[in-house]
């Protein structure tokens, strides 16, 4: 399998990643909107290439608690994907999916099993939308694993894909 360094990736690669992101996020927004029964406003995805060591600080405070949905991909492409949500968005999405209304959440309120399952499904749909866009645009077969979910500090959650990246080299 071909591996590239950041120095070898040119503007064309970044444009391709942006286009895949546009298609994938559009499909994901439509799927999630249908699930929650409300319109989803999406921003145009941004693509930034950076060393893994800088990833934590790029997404926000490393000690902030976030929700991470992680899965591995295999077949024509081997790798992993992670979808991150802040706690407020996670509670909002879980409440919408489970049809809970007017719920006030404490800042560090723990998610119950049903809420975690609903959020895992959202992450599964979003990552599958991106993978589907990538597969259809490249004619590659890409198989996702069952997703895993974790609620922890951003630095702890991001250490999982970073460790996998360094052990696969």
Short names for language-model regions:
Residues 4-15, 57, 111, 133, ...:
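Polyanion-binding surfaces on beta-sheet-dominated domains and ring/shell assemblies
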Residues 43-56, 144-161:
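Beta-rich nucleic-acid/ligand-interaction surfaces
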Residues 38-76:
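Translation machinery proteins
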Residues 72-114:
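Ordered, amphipathic secondary-structure segments that act as subunit-interaction surfaces
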Residues 166-169:
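Conserved small/polar residues in nucleotide/adenosyl-binding loops
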Residues 1-35:
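Short, extreme N-terminal leader segments that mark the start of a protein/domain
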Residues 36-44, 137-146:
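Flexible, glycine/charged-enriched surface loops at secondary-structure junctions
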Residues 116-140:
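Surface-exposed interaction/gating patches
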